[in-house]
A protein has these predicted regions:
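Metal-associated gating/positioning segment near the N- to mid-region
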Residues: 1-45
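Metal-coordinating catalytic core of metallo-dependent amide/deamination hydrolases
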Residues: 26-47, 51-54, 59-169
Length: 171
């Protein structure tokens, strides 16, 4: 649905991510577009991308959620990944990235969103076998180290493998 290709060019030209975000771009713009897309549209987009992967010889792809940023939408994205994975010879490794950024509707309630990810999203994804990994984005404008620890502890308690990507944007 939403893609950040135009923002990639801005980053190559030296524009800081914060400036792109303030101009209405960034992860939140992609979240809005992704939330509006139907499962069928998301499946079509994913099928096209996987076809490109296979054409270039890829045999494995980790595919992350992270553009729904609420339980219902993150589950929708992981279901799409799981369904399309059944149609391809490429090994698809789904990853829950519900802790990508705090969505705008939780901007003044960060604590509530961290709880939602740790106590609602992670257990539901685990129970329904929708993801292999749980990932957290710890960086400026994303999650703090302590918030990341809390979410990853929730995954650890369920024996889900954990990932962290950090300092992607920070100086």
């Amino acid at each position: 649905a939403g893609t950040p290709e135009d923002e990639f060019m801005m980053r190559l030209q030296g524009r800081p991510y914060e400036e792109i975000q303030e101009a209405g771009g960034g992860i939140v713009r992609t979240v809005r577009a992704t939330r509006m897309a139907s499962e069928e549209k998301l499946q079509d987009i994913l099928r096209r991308n996987i076809f490109k992967f296979s054409r270039y010889g890829s045999t494995t792809a980790e595919i992350k959620s992270g553009y729904g940023l609420n339980t219902e939408e993150e589950i929708k994205l992981l279901r799409v990944i799981k369904e399309v994975a059944l149609e391809t010879d490429i090994l698809i490794v789904p990853t829950l990235l519900g802790a990508h950024v705090v969505p705008p509707e939780f901007a003044s309630r960060r604590r509530k969103y961290v709880d939602l990810v740790a106590k609602d999203m992670v257990p539901m994804v685990h129970e329904n076998h929708l993801a292999v990994f749980v990932d957290v984005f710890v960086d400026t404008g994303a999650f703090t180290l302590e918030e990341g620890r809390e979410i990853l502890r929730a995954a650890q308690e369920l024996d889900m493998p954990r990932k962290l990507h950090a300092d992607q944007l920070g100086e």
